[in-house]
Amino acid sequence: MITPEKLLEAAKQLEPQLQEWRRTLHRHPEVGFDLPQTKALVKKALTEMGYAPQDCGKCGVLALAGGKKPGKVILLRGDMDALPLQEESGEEFASELPGKMHGCGHDMHTAMVLGAAKLLKEHEDEIEGTVKLEFQPAEEIFQGSLDMINSGLLENPKVDAAVMFHVLAGMPLPAGMVLVPGGGITMASCEQYHIVVHGKGGHGSMPNACIDPITAAAHIHIALQEINSRELDPAGFGVFTTGRFEAGKASNVIPDSADMWGTIRTIDPEQKVSAQIHQRMTEIAQGVATAYRCTAEVTFSDYCPCMVVDKPLAQNALTYMTELLGRGALDMTAITGGKPGGGSEDFAFVSHEVPTVSMFLSAGNAKEGYLYGQHHPKVRFDDSVLYKGSAAYTYMALRWLADHKE
């Protein structure tokens, strides 16, 4: 098998191509399941490498490397979708599409897995089994992973282990460092809520003839904060945030309704905290609405479970990343103390089906000029780390398959 040094050297030679892929994707961000240009770029690149890419689900792409020798199957995932965000990064290759931006680094992930595909194809005879390459849409809306699972992602051939990386910007870590978690729950579950308050609209000069849904919705929003501060166990992790509030179109019109949308995050595999939040949020919204002569509807959607990292696979990953990067690999528990984070990731659906490890790659810190974190309109990512990401994906696959021959 290729040595770590040779693999890093080969990956480094791909750097111009990796940056070209990434910057092309960055200029043309697409969101959700609507990724025609992104998907076309991925399939074209894979075909030129000698793969036969296959569609999976609404907009996913799969390709297989290896398979010439018997062995297990490892899945490498890169997500492809962008955010509905107006870019303010100042990059020369900034988004050319108003209101859309690769503000979470998925363009980086796609390029990294394409780089891994190139390296694996060049060393296909060394693969002791099969590597399944996954390019996933709709991670930002927590729907893409489940859609691909339901479309056969983990079958034909059946996946034995799964790996993903996520880049980090604006964190106090040198660019190019890989963080490996220790196992167990590492990320929170996530779901969305939508509260609609119905009143009776009319002229702003005659509130007495109306039933104002904005007033009711404002009081609902304030009342809901009692759940966070007074009802949830402070020793656990459960939080929700209303991030969007809309009502009316004109300043002199009381609207018929007001809407609130938000997110719920919990670290609770049994979903007891989620159930508590659901119950109390519904009771409070409907009760307060009634007090203000309104009615309220509360709905919950897009549930995504906690990310569960397989401990033996994580231990393998730390060993392999240390072999590849030396001190450039770090046990994440040294930073987190083993505590899960409040972020969410829909690859969690895969983690509940097969042993999974979710790692991180630092892509710039404040001292290096990368001041902002993910989902900020000014976030920037250091794409000089792309080759390390491609090498890490490749080495993880080669080493794990070699160590787990059937």
What are these regions (language model features)?
Residues 25, 76, 106, 133, ...:
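Divalent metal-coordination and catalytic microenvironments
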Residues 83, 90-101, 108, 120-255, ...:
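Histidine/acidic-residue-rich, glycine-tolerant segments that coordinate divalent metal ions
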Residues 218-406:
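Metal-dependent amide/peptide-bond hydrolase catalytic core
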Residues 26-28, 102, 106-109, 166, ...:
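Histidine-centered active-site/metal-ligand motif
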Residues 2-102, 107, 111-128:
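Acidic/His- and Gly-rich active-site-bordering loop/insert found
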Residues 77, 86, 193-195, 358-364:
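Non-cysteine beta-strand/loop elements that form the S-adenosyl-L-methionine
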Residues 3, 14-21, 34-45, 72, ...:
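General structural feature for long, well-ordered alpha-helical segments within catalytic domains
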